[in-house]
Amino acid sequence: KDIPKMISLMNVEKIDITAARTLVFSGDDLISGYESKFNFAAGTAFSGSGKVIFVLNSVDQNGESNIVISFERDNERVRSTLSATRYVVTEYGIASLFGKSIRERALSLIEIANPENSEKLFNTAKEHGYIYPDQIYRSIAANYPSRLETVKTFKDGLELKIRPVKASDEDMMRRLFYKFSDESKYYRYFTHVKVMPHKNMQKYLSVDYDIIVSIVAFHQTVNIEKIVSESRYAAYPSGDSYEMAFLVDEEYQGRGIATFMTNYLIKIARERGIKKLVASVLSQNRKMLEVFDKVTVKPVKQYDGDTVELEFRL
């Protein structure tokens, strides 16, 4: 507690799908022993802004996943992570686990597993009840565009992490939805949406990073990580244009987040050769119209009753 911002890096052989237990390397008990390493990790968890990071290869020498449902052998080398895990890292990405449910942890670790093992791991996790029985597996998730990850500082020094959405973000996206007022929900969905069950949110987050791209902004503090904004575009069936929309947590509005997220989406669309983005906005939604007027590409507007149709020619 007296040493802030401590970092503990733990290299392990395997980890279970909830990040509750690990398999330490054989021979890693020399000198001080692996018990002292886990004690150090536990101490790091109590440090102000401390981070405990577990690092491992996604597969072993036989090509088997090092992220496992349970440990079938070498139980004498299995150790508890002492609930200290904040991040797990493989060559396929980083899983942020602090404050997450077992289901969120399982999905996060599947996302950083070797793509050749991830579907089997997904199905086994479903059989053991770690994830929803109707959870959708999308092999396209292996195409996660990590190059789109960035960090942006906004007014009042607010730092947000920006990245493509993942299936494991479902609970955080649902919490964001329930924070919005009825008016904001109506402006976004053009109807009175009261609830957002798993089946609807899962479908919403089933993006392919190609014809549907969704970018989210995270605010991370010592105690919590939450999504405060999302922007997305999706191709019309005709394929000649893409519909764009965004939302920002009402608590975080007025800091330029919406303008940045929209401009970032336009930048991605341009890089991918998309020629036209469109948006439909209710005429009384002045805040959203003001944001679209501020972006780098000025829209062509058409008025259709209570709706304003905007076209962004890239």
Locate the predicted segments by residue.
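Conserved phosphate- and dinucleotide-binding cores of soluble alpha/beta proteins
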Residues: 1-136
